[in-house]
Amino acid sequence: MTLQLNTIALLLVILLILGVLSNNSTITISAAVLLIMQQTFLSSHIPLLEKYGVKIGIIILTIGVLSPLVSGKIQLPDLSGFLSWKMALSISVGVLVAWLAGKGVPLMGEQPILVTGLLIGTIIGVAFLGGIPVGPLIAAGILALLLGKI
């Protein structure tokens, strides 16, 4: 087995270092897994990860968000809780963000070059601002809105 020293491998190493330096396990683990996959026999599975990775990630994220409700750590509010302005605002924001993310997916497919910018912005946000890497979908939706694609 020989190492493939290319631009992508270098980027993954830089991300790995940034993840360690910024104490961000999400970036560190993601970059390490992808670097290992790229440099080994697992590279044949990268297209599968590319095709289903976001969907699987969203499923896992949704399970993580819903699990406190299922475990009983978070209780459903009574009817008056649903009628408060904070609940109405939170539902509205949830709808807006989901709609924006849905509009971002087609933009990412139509103009894949923009994905690079979105990823760089997401990496900066995760590595240095304590963000979470669900940003590309929402960022693409906001970008689609700004570009007049919506």
From Swiss-Prot:
Keywords, alphabetical: Cell membrane, Membrane, Transmembrane, Transmembrane helix
Entry keyword Transmembrane: yes
Membrane spanning stretches: 1-21, 52-72, 81-101, 123-143
Cell compartment(s), UniProt: Cell membrane
Main localization (coarse): membrane
One Pfam short name: DUF441
InterPro entries, sorted: UPF0756_TM
One GO CC term on file: plasma membrane
Membrane topology: Multi-pass membrane protein
Family (UniProt): Belongs to the UPF0756 family.
Name of the molecule in the record: UPF0756 membrane protein HI_1074
